[in-house]
Amino acid sequence: MKIILATQNKRKLDEFIELSKNSNYPINFVIKPLKEDIGEIEENGNSYFENALIKANAVFNYYKEPVLSDDSGLELPEFKEILGIYSSRFAGINATDKENRYKLLDYLKSKNITETSAKYVCVLVYIFNQGEALSFKGEWEGKIIVSDNLNLDTGFGYDPMFVPKEYTITVSEMSISEKNLISHRAKAVNQFLNFLKDKK
């Protein structure tokens, strides 16, 4: 089964392929030249679901093929005014992951915080017929740590700062296979795969 992944991020494509490879339901995830074909998709929703739905609708309406989109972010319960659906552009619209991490480090330092509870959230939206959209949600609880000893120069998202619950290491220090068993995206993808399996 071919499903278009509503992203231009090759790293995200690789992650979805890895997450689904052990499924009994064979999926061929592909990415398309969205910017060239559709143009910039404005994610102006007020929730992860709304942003994922905007992307999924735009891609489905153009290609008329099954589409899976996701929107994800980091939430800090003690600092609800930051991050969330704006996590990927915390330091600016075109900010890099590295820039976002350093801005978060500086922000929390200014509040004299050494660690704070946190959770990653991922919402998937799947469209396979016109007007039919299903959503799947995964959450990953833990904490953000603040330290000058962190290596914030490399890594994905806020992984170099995020320590999952019941762990003593950051996500960046975990193996990819270990992360893919317990991450927020893994949980959402597993729900999606179970839906496909039950739908057969």
From Swiss-Prot:
Query: What GO biological process terms does the UniProt entry carry, in alphabetical order?
Result: nucleotide metabolic process; purine nucleoside triphosphate catabolic process
A GO cellular component annotated for this chain's UniProt record is: cytosol
What does the similarity note say? Belongs to the HAM1 NTPase family.
State the name under which the record lists this protein. dITP/XTP pyrophosphatase
Cofactor-binding details, from the entry: Binds 1 Mg(2+) ion per subunit.
Q: Which Pfam families match?
A: Ham1p_like (PF01725)
> What Enzyme Commission number(s) apply to this enzyme?
3.6.1.66
The UniProt GO MF terms for this protein read: dITP diphosphatase activity; ITP diphosphatase activity; metal ion binding; nucleotide binding; ribonucleoside triphosphate phosphatase activity; XTP diphosphatase activity
